[in-house]
Amino acid sequence: QQAIDDLVDQFEPESVKTVFSTTSQSHAASEYFESSGDKIRFFFEEAVFDECGDLTTPKAEALNKIGHALHDLHPVFESFSYHPRLARLAEQLDLEDPRLIQSMVIFKQPKIGGEVIWHQDSTFLYTEPMSATGFWFALEDANLQNGCLWVLPGEHHNGLRQRFCRVDGQLKNLDFPDALPFDVARAVPLEVSRGTLVMLNGLLPHYSKANVSDQSRCAYTLHTVSGKALYPADNWLQRGPDMPLRSLSTGATE
């Protein structure tokens, strides 16, 4: 938590005002967002700026998330993300050559923490074959009031519905033919205590409601993909050649 607080303290909000929203997807047109795969960048909640573009709330209470390469660029997050216990867990789950590709601090701020619509992580971290896996760490208690995760048990067996990728220089959602809508009537909430790790198959649909409570619901997330799978060049999340993906098991790039 101290590392998160330090990052926020050092962040100068005057330098960027990119909003992250899964409902409006306004961030998709932002170069700041598009090029964040190998950087540490800050994204705001909606409705935290006035008509002049000034923050209406303290920056620590206005951020939606920090991403997407904390695990490789910040020593505290790096030490946690490449911990041998996570490598052993990945081995127990038979993850093939897991490579850390994304990390995020998700704040889910009190009162203004936005809804995250139903989605599958493989939509954004597409590989052939599918290999994305999510590690979701509850940094605070997550409950129905402050926007806990909801999932659709077993739905990961029904394939990928959508892909978020670059088309003619723009980021777009592409629907797969014959994709069926999610049966959200079967949704199950995941209320968990601080310190809980939730593992998410990349094809498992999940969602969280807006946080209308007085309590934040902060989480740290990691995502891996297989180093043996194809990671297409038109995926939205890309890295420069000077920062290849590192093995969760060894921390090495080979």
What is each PLM-predicted segment?
Residues 38, 45, 131-133, 216-218:
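A generic structural signal for short beta-strands and their flanking turns/coil linkers
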Residues 80, 188-191:
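Exposed beta-sheet edge/beta-hairpin loop segments within beta-rich domains
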Residues 1-115, 235, 243-248:
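Non-heme Fe(II)-dependent double-stranded beta-helix
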Residues 103-105, 135-137, 220-224:
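A structural signal for short, well-ordered beta-strand segments
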Residues 73, 87-91, 99, 112-189, ...:
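Catalytic core of non-heme Fe(II) oxygenases with the double-stranded beta-helix
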Residues 13-17, 156-169, 194-199, 203-254:
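Non-heme Fe(II)/2-oxoglutarate
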Residues 107-121, 202-207:
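Conserved short histidine dyad/triad with adjacent acidic residue
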